[in-house]
Amino acid sequence: MQFCLVTAVRFSFRYVSLERVRRTQNEKAIHNAMIIGAGAAGQMILRELKTSTESTARPCCIIDDNPNKWGRIMEGVPVVGGRENILENVEKYNIDQILFAIPSAHAKEKRDILNICKETQCELRSLPGTYQLVNGDVSLSKMKPVAVEDLLGREPIKVNMDEIFQYLKGKTILVTGGGGSIGSELCRQIASHNPKQLIIFDIYENNAYDIEQELKRKYKDLNLKVLIGSVRDSRRINMVFEQYHPDIVYHAAAHKHVPLMETSPNEAIKNNVIGTYKTAYAAMKYGAQRFVLISTDKAVNPTNIMGASKRLCEMVVQSMDAISKAGRIDLLPFLHAHMDKVIDGQLAGDPLDHMAADGMSAKDSTINIESTRNKDHKGTQYVAVRFGNVLGSNGSVIPLFRKQIEAGGPVTVTHPDIVRYFMTIPEAVSLVLQAGTYAWGGEIFVLDMGEAVKIDTLARNLIRLSGFEPDVDIQLEYTGLRPGEKLYEEKLMAEEGIKKTDNELIHIGKPIPFDTEVFLKQLEELAKASYENSDHIVEMVEEIVTTFHPAGEHPCYDKKS
């Protein structure tokens, strides 16, 4: 009798609870939902939908590619077929929301299924990949709107977090350009690895302030220093290194906008090339352990001055590494105020002002440089990390497309066949951090970014994900290639080849050999010309970077007669 009473009470409570759920759902606008995946994750999502008082989704059918599951009924919901049955069942059940619940799906499989789903104009939501789920936590709250990144079909980058943690733990780390898209994500990931001190160096105070406030909120115990300054300012750079003595430098400060640099090539050289030289020089002078340059696939066979300037940055890094290994600091030239003379322990003036009067040579300057280095220092290791376009970064196509869609169009694409390699900002930064653990010095690390993506396809996908139909609701407009822009970008120069690392997605390019002493002399002339705002700067760059072939007639190119 007692057992029956207890059972009746429990049944009544269960009935009342379910009735309350149904009543609450009926009071809201109900969405007919399709679940992709009849595995463990899909079943957990299904059960939560059935019992949640908050969800407005009503599960109507399930899709799974396993034929053995077809025809089954799960929690009262039928498994109606595989991916080829998505479109017909969306129409049959009047589906307006699709939930992708296969966290273990490979990127290509996920892309193929979502490409079918986006034809339906349904709202698309997805669980993150298994590697992103903490302790396998599967729930409706983890369902996020499908982003354009999900349609790229790239496998997520997996890095050795233990190696990165040990590499960064207890180190003083400087990030130049720390307020930018890549720089700020570097700071976020570094902050989570228990550094001794994180120094953010940026010329744009608003960007620096934003990341400072974010990190202070998230990491209460982080020893954070935010400094404003330019990598073109030798005195400021030297003062920062002298005061903080960073162990590791991530050099992300750079001009990166291709069309703007085409019309201001001297600025590209001053900021990108000379700024890299000055920062790398200070790293050697003050005994940094490692210097990591953020480079780009536009440095491969460049057709624009921005890409060529980044190739020059890579050559600076390789030259610095060779000089560091050889201990030949005397080979380093003075680059238009790249360092300051020390008089009675004080920084004083531009060395160019004193060299002629004092008979001072580059070799004489090594006395001051060597005195600043740690006695146990074995030389700075210099490396570069090269990757493609990052989704969502400042100036990238995704934010531009979103603004154009919000405005009702048109969405502008330069050429219907233009392709680019893409990755997410966190992926790019993970690569940079992992590459730092592999570095011996002189390497150019390259990410295997999978297949190139047509920008036209990317734009159309983004329009569909926004709930519109391309060429119907939102028009596409082809504007023509911009100055310095090319249809295809390459990951490696043919002469470089690749070498494997422990991470199958990270490779090392075999550097193209060049004469370091000759290059440094050319760099000295290039620096002088850039500060004189020379009309011949593009021509000079073309002579140094033999793989640089400006696209079309360059606006600042002065041909030889």
Features from the language model and the residues they span:
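Flexible, Lys/Arg-rich cytosolic regulatory linkers and terminal tails that connect or flank
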Residues: 83, 110-172, 284
